[in-house]
Curated annotation (Swiss-Prot):
Identification of the protein by name: Nuclear export protein
HAMAP family: INFV_NEP
Keywords, comma-separated and alphabetical: Host nucleus, Host-virus interaction, Transport, Virion
Organism, scientific name: Influenza A virus (strain A/Grey teal/Australia/2/1979 H4N4)
Role, per record: Mediates the nuclear export of encapsidated genomic RNAs (ribonucleoproteins, RNPs). Acts as an adapter between viral RNPs complexes and the nuclear export machinery of the cell. Possesses no intrinsic RNA-binding activity, but includes a C-terminal M1-binding domain. This domain is believed to allow recognition of RNPs bound to the protein M1.
InterPro entries: Flu_NS2
Length: 121
């Protein structure tokens, strides 16, 4: 993963953790946790691709990696919809900027995970 993506994840997670969205703070914490989980999953796929011969190791470690991959894409789609919804309802410019950056990052990560997964198939 390049350093820009790492800093983007860290920046967005830090910004989201500082937001106070009232009664929806539990939802926001859930989004933050999913963002962190997605980052770790993306990193592990990237490492497997870098080792390239690691497909068998990946399959042995997690025999259901295709199912897990599908599940991660569902999580990404859910997060994208949730971020879009938050973007529509917020009037705070700090939150709007944060959610716009989060949306852009999610779209980039989705594309990277697709690229990694095609290389592993």
């Amino acid at each position: 993963m390049d350093s820009n993506t790492v800093s983007s994840f860290q920046d967005i997670l830090m910004r989201m953790s500082k937001m106070q969205l009232g009664s929806s703070s539990e939802d926001l914490n859930g989004m933050i946790i999913q963002f962190e989980s997605l980052k770790l999953y993306r990193d592990s796929l990237g490492e497997a691709v870098m080792r390239m011969g690691d497909l068998h190791s990946l399959q042995n470690r997690n025999g259901k990696w295709r199912e897990q991959l599908s599940q991660k894409f569902e999580e990404i789609r859910w997060l994208i919809e949730e971020v879009r919804h938050r973007l529509k309802i917020t009037e705070n410019s700090f939150e709007q900027i944060t959610f716009m950056q989060a949306l852009q990052l999610l779209l980039e990560v989705e594309q990277e995970i697709r690229t990694f997964s095609f290389q592993l198939i």
